[in-house]
């Protein structure tokens, strides 16, 4: 497994690391970002920060040289989802996601909405099973499959709809690469360097384990954002991944 770059011709970094920004204050988020190098990672903006600070936060990060994964997990009727995905592309994000459970028509509409953007379109991925969910959580929703089985079913639907890949747990990555092929991108949260606390994630792996499993992009949050020296932490993670590769 080697580092994979964005499909965009203007890729900033070849690191597979995506740092999750989870801040309540814009100034603190930007102060953290100013400590790290866009050559060492990409950045993920989720629902809370986007709701608080809007598209301008994404522009602020882009102006600092970072690729941005807009993690809003769109899940709505096909037309609404398509418009939202197109708006994300207009914003110039590197990656955007939808919920695979929204179904084939919704995912196909999202895919088609990106066609006018050509090579400048963001990667479009789908969320399968949230990494916080266990078998009992799925059973509560009437799903009798295990998280791995349900994730694979949704991943297959995602590929059939022509999306670029899925969000999945690292434990599913090995099989997904075998089943769906190397070109189908796997984005994995719940990645934590050895010695880090699990937090609210239930299915976790170290960066080295994730790379070996076939993960293309690994989302890492607090182990980097709460580090006393986040720039060095990122360099250490990337160095360990290069050794693993």
UniProtKB/Swiss-Prot annotation:
SMART domains linked: OMPdecase
Domain of life per record: Bacteria
Pathway: Pyrimidine metabolism; UMP biosynthesis via de novo pathway; UMP from orotate: step 2/2
Active-site residue numbers: 73
Xref: InterPro entries: Aldolase_TIM, OMPdecase, OMPdecase_AS, OMPdecase_bac, OMPdeCOase_dom, RibuloseP-bd_barrel
Entry's Gene Ontology BP terms: 'de novo' pyrimidine nucleobase biosynthetic process; 'de novo' UMP biosynthetic process
CC annotations in GO: cytosol
Any Pfam family hit: OMPdecase
Annotated substrate binding sites: 22, 44, 71-80, 131, 192, 201, 221-222
Class of the enzyme per the UniProt entry, highest EC level: lyase
Catalytic reactions on record: orotidine 5'-phosphate + H(+) = UMP + CO2
The protein's role, per its UniProt record: Catalyzes the decarboxylation of orotidine 5'-monophosphate (OMP) to uridine 5'-monophosphate (UMP).
Quaternary organization: Homodimer.
Protein name: Orotidine 5'-phosphate decarboxylase
């Amino acid at each position: 497994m080697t580092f994979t770059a964005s499909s965009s011709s203007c890729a900033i970094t070849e690191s597979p690391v995506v740092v999750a920004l989870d801040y309540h204050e814009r100034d603190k988020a930007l102060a953290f970002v100013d400590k790290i190098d866009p050559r060492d990672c990409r950045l993920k903006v989720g629902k809370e920060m986007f709701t608080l600070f809007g598209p301008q936060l994404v522009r602020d990060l882009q102006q600092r040289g970072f690729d941005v994964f807009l993690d809003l997990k769109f899940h709505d009727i096909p037309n609404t989802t398509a418009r939202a995905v197109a708006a994300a592309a207009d914003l110039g994000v590197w990656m955007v996601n939808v919920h695979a459970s929204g179904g084939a028509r919704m995912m196909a509409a999202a895919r088609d909405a990106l066609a006018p953007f050509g090579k400048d379109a963001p990667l479009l991925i789908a969320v399968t099973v949230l990494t916080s969910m266990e078998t009992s959580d799925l059973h509560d929703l009437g799903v009798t499959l295990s998280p791995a089985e349900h994730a694979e079913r949704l991943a297959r639907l995602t590929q059939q709809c022509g999306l670029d890949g899925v969000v999945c747990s690292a434990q599913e990555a090995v099989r997904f690469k075998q089943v769906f092929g190397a070109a189908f991108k796997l984005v994995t949260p719940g990645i934590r360097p050895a010695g880090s606390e699990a937090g609210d994630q239930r299915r976790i792996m170290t960066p080295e384990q994730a790379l070996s499993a076939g993960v293309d992009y690994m989302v890492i949050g607090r182990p980097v954002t709460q580090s006393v020296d986040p720039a060095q932490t990122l360099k250490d993670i990337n160095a360990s991944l290069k050794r693993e590769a």
